[in-house]
Amino acid sequence: MSGHSKWATTKHKKAAIDAKRGKLFARLIKNIEVAARLGGGDPSGNPTLYDAIQKAKKSSVPNDNITRAVKRGSGEGADAVNYETIMYEAYGPAGVAILIECLTDNRNRAVSDVRVAVTRNGGTMADGGSVQRLFQRKGVVSVSKTYEVEEGRKTETREVDEDQLMEATIDAEPEDIVDEGEVFEIISDPSAVVDVRKAVQGAGIDYDSAEVSFKPDFTQRVELEDARKLYRILDALEDLDDVQNVFSNVDIPAEVAAALDEEE
């Protein structure tokens, strides 16, 4: 850390965190705009929009920003938007499969930026379909193991376990409930994700997000050096404005994850 004060280091970290937060907000706003464009601006009749708004609120996106995004997406005002979804495919170190989902108003810019982010960091672009066939589209409802509810003037912390979720969602026929550490992921057919989400809500349980995602058929284990290389690719992709989601089949062992955390 030669030549850097503690304040300068802290300031740099805060700037990096603020930049990531800004990019997260931009992605969440895009989700809202696209959902409103495809299904209308009324969340009560557009479950995809409802869930996009819920996810944005969970990430503390201001209500005014959400309202403006709904209006833009539904064609109100001069700044109405029109994005297209494009999926790119790549391989990282150790053969890790990577799916890159873009929401863009400029296809040429998106593909150029993605290609640079992948190839300059040691990855290779893949032919269409060669990577996507290794994944399945699934509905995913994420539920935190602890959540807060308002009880009168007090805030009460509640806990939820796998048995409660299984009982709450059984009629919605989820395929699996996966323990992901601080959250449970309730996996379903994409067509059932709204039913699962409503079942969770109907049981009085809070949820973090409900969306269609890509889940790998198998995972690829990596060691420390390959994990470092992969993170460089993923970080470069996450920095791109057109990239909305990145999915991979990487399996990072706990000891490798701990070593990476120490390096940050």
Curated annotation (Swiss-Prot):
Keywords: Cytoplasm, DNA-binding, Transcription, Transcription regulation. One of its GO terms (cellular component) is cytosol. It is found in: Cytoplasm. Pfam families: TACO1_YebC_N, Transcrip_reg. GO terms for molecular function: DNA binding. InterPro entries: Integrase-like_N, TACO1_YebC-like_2nd/3rd_dom, TACO1_YebC_N, Transcrip_reg_TACO1-like, Transcrip_reg_TACO1-like_dom3, YebC-like. This is Probable transcriptional regulatory protein PPA1157. It comes from Cutibacterium acnes (strain DSM 16379 / KPA171202).
